[in-house]
From Swiss-Prot:
It is found in: Cell membrane. This is Lipoteichoic acid synthase-like YvgJ. Although its sequence similarity with the glycerol phosphate lipoteichoic acid synthase LtaS, it cannot restore staphylococcal growth and LTA synthesis after ltaS depletion. Residues 1-10, 63-68, 137-153 are cytoplasmic. Substrate binds at H408. The chain crosses the membrane at residues 11-31, 42-62, 69-89, 116-136, 154-171. Keywords: Cell membrane, Manganese, Membrane, Metal-binding, Secreted, Transmembrane, Transmembrane helix. GO terms for cellular component: extracellular region; membrane; plasma membrane. Mn(2+) binds at E251, T293, D467, H468. It comes from the Bacteria. Proteolytically cleaved. One of its GO terms (molecular function) is metal ion binding. InterPro entries: Alkaline_phosphatase_core_sf (IPR017850), LtaS-like (IPR012160), OpgB/LTA_synthase_biosynth (IPR050448), Sulfatase_N (IPR000917).
Length: 617
């Protein structure tokens, strides 16, 4: 036995075994990865080895003390990566990417969120390191570097494992690396650590795209957006011409709370009533990615899709954009954003200059006291009340944007502000969520009253829009309880990406309200609002279309490649009936829309990575 690889390299073998087990345990318990087949389970089991084996194998080139130090450090680093991804996944249902690391400035404002997601059991992931340290102290014996033939055999096996992983990935999802909008599929197929390497390479390629871009790069994109343009409904074009715009972004607000009750009390009584006097959209989807609220701002302003990795507000703040703010400025509109948080959060102070916004009211412009604030900033009621007074001083017409805060993860609220009982389910987060949504709804009601008091209501177009989901897939069991379902399917998860979108034009929509049932998303907001203001968008490079146009093809694509039409929902490589939620026998029915979804996301990425709008007037 003395000549065996295990006997000579016990510390290495134990290090590999423990790291393999830890990674697989995190796959199963830390992430909500959908495993449908035995092949997918096999891939999940073996893919950690295709990274751990070659990395830890470096220890074969080192003598005993250096080898053990290297393996312990490698184990520690990979464990930290696992825990960091688990915490990140707990909120975003996503994995850390390189651009996210440049958002470290946000962490100072996220203390309560990280605390909510950190689990004491994470400490158990370091137990193997303690064992390895004790093992190293008790089993010291002279050791030289491994023989060349041993290293060759070891790396031959490592290469075989890597090739096996890639082959299985290709069988499961052909051309996976070429069409990588779905990070979950990448992690399931090639592994978490390998995904981080792939992401690093992708970001390097994206950075180089800007250097090699030229004026010809924008031509194909112009041709696509011009061909996809939908003419506005002339009966609605210019309905709000000359009016002020008051656009309120509703933090973490999803549509499933609308017209729902807890213990007989409505969660959103004000919005429920306002919908009856407005243009509202039943199948309106959030399309954000890792930038969350900042992504929703970006999408609305530009009618482009956000970056697949990181937040555009951080990674592309030096690029050129043809925002709605700039377009409306040509029609004498003054623009302002109100947000009672620090101006540097999400790099807003820099990006708002890039967007052409005239004025940014941040936390320093508001009167904030311990009693009127939360961990994220000023409470919604006080924020909107103070904002209404500031709004009156702006030059008119104006386009104003407000970003609420109280309904923010982890959805905590003072007892004095609680207007409804918590929901009763297996998720404390969902239980609290209904109370912060209820408070937000009451704050909106109060805001409308203040607008009337300030004389700003009648001559304005008032818009409410949810920015992104608040309750992630990690709480699907409780969500099924809320919705009265046995389980939440992938189809249901897509439906839960619906957010409120309400356009209220006093004197018009209260006389002729309308509920639009067609599929649409945040990318459609820019042309919809511009056309209501009487500003034509034909010729603009935008991927959205006027939601009120009868010429529009109902369609919404999420950033991960899932999409929705009036007939189909496509997600997790499966085509569903939009009406029934059942898996379709004819899976090819979704193919034409899948091509459209991939093309739009790819073209939008080219604009962002190449800074192509600098070549367009």
């Amino acid at each position: 036995m003395k000549g065996t690889f295990f006997h000579n390299q016990r510390f290495l073998c134990f290090s590999i075994l423990f790291m393999w087990i830890k990674t697989y345990v995190i796959y199963k318990l830390g992430f909500d990865l959908q495993i449908d087949t035995l092949l997918e389970e096999l891939m999940l089991l073996v893919n950690p080895l295709s990274f751990i084996l070659p990395l830890f194998g470096i220890g074969l080139f080192l003598k005993e003390n250096k080898q053990r130090a290297f393996l312990l450090i490698a184990n520690l680093v990979l464990t930290v990566i696992l825990i960091s991804n688990t915490i990140f996944y707990g909120f975003y249902i996503d994995f850390i990417t390189i651009p996210v690391l440049f958002q470290a400035s946000n962490m100072s404002d996220m203390g309560s969120s990280v605390k909510e997601l950190f689990h004491p059991l994470f400490i158990a992931l370091f137990v193997d390191l303690v064992f390895l340290l004790l093992f190293a102290r008790k089993t010291k014996h002279p050791q030289t570097k491994a023989a060349p033939h041993t290293i060759k055999r070891y790396y031959a096996a490592s290469c075989g494992m890597l090739l096996c992983t890639l082959a299985l990935a290709e069988v499961q999802q052909p051309k996976l690396l070429a069409h990588s909008f779905d990070r979950e599929m990448l992690v399931k197929s090639i592994g978490l650590f390998q995904f981080h390497i792939y992401d690093t390479i992708s970001q390097t390629v994206n950075i180089s795209a800007k250097a090699f871009a030229d004026e010809d790069s924008i031509t194909a994109i112009k041709n696509y957006t011009e061909a996809d343009y939908s003419k506005p409904d002339q009966s609605k074009f210019g309905l709000a011409k000359g009016r002020n715009v008051i656009f309120v972004t509703l933090e973490s607000t999803q549509s499933f709370v609308l017209n729902e009750k807890v213990n007989g009390k409505e969660i959103t009584p004000f919005m429920n009533d306002l919908i009856k006097k407005s243009y509202s959209f039943d199948h309106f989807y959030q399309q954000t990615e890792q930038g969350k609220t900042s992504d929703s701002e970006f999408i609305v302003a530009n009618s482009l899709y956000p970056s697949l990795s990181g937040a555009v507000f951080f990674t592309k703040s030096d690029h050129q954009f043809h925002t709605m703010y700039k377009s409306l400025k040509q029609h004498d509109y003054y623009s302002a954003v109100f947000h009672a948080n620090h101006k540097t959060f999400w790099n807003r102070d820099v990006m708002y200059d890039t967007f052409g916004i005239d004025r940014f009211f941040d936390v320093d412009d508001f009167h904030v006291t311990p009693g009127t604030s939360t961990s994220w900033g000023l409470k919604d009621k006080e924020f909107l009340e103070q904002s209404a007074k500031k709004l009156k001083s702006l030059p008119q017409p104006f386009y104003s944007s407000f970003i609420t805060l109280t309904n923010h993860f982890p959805f905590e609220i003072d007892e004095k502000d609680q207007l409804i009982d918590e929901f009763d389910s297996s998720s404390d987060l969902l239980n609290r969520y209904v109370t912060t949504v209820r408070y937000e709804d009451e704050a909106l009601k109060h805001f409308i009253k203040k607008l009337k008091d300030e004389g700003l209501y009648e001559n304005s177009m008032i818009v409410f829009m949810g920015d992104h989901y608040g309750i992630s897939e990690a709480h699907n069991e409780a969500m099924a309880e809320f919705l009265g379902k046995d389980e939440i399917t992938p189809y249901d998860n897509v439906q839960l990406q619906r957010v409120p979108f309400i356009i209220h034009i006093p004197g018009i929509t209260d006389q002729q309200p309308e509920t639009i049932p067609d599929a649409g998303g945040q990318v459609d907001v820019r042309p919809t609002l511009m056309h209501l203001l009487g500003v034509e968008t034909k010729g603009d490079i935008q991927f959205g279309n006027d939601l009120l146009s009868g010429d529009r093809t109902p369609f919404a694509v999420l950033r991960n490649g899932s999409f929705i039409t009036n007939d189909y929902v496509y997600t997790k490589n499966t085509c569903y009936s939009q009406k029934t939620g059942e898996v379709l026998e004819d899976q090819d029915a979704c193919l034409p829309y899948k091509e459209k979804a991939n093309e739009e996301l790819s073209l939008s990425d080219k604009i962002l990575n190449g800074d192509l709008l600098r070549f367009s007037e």
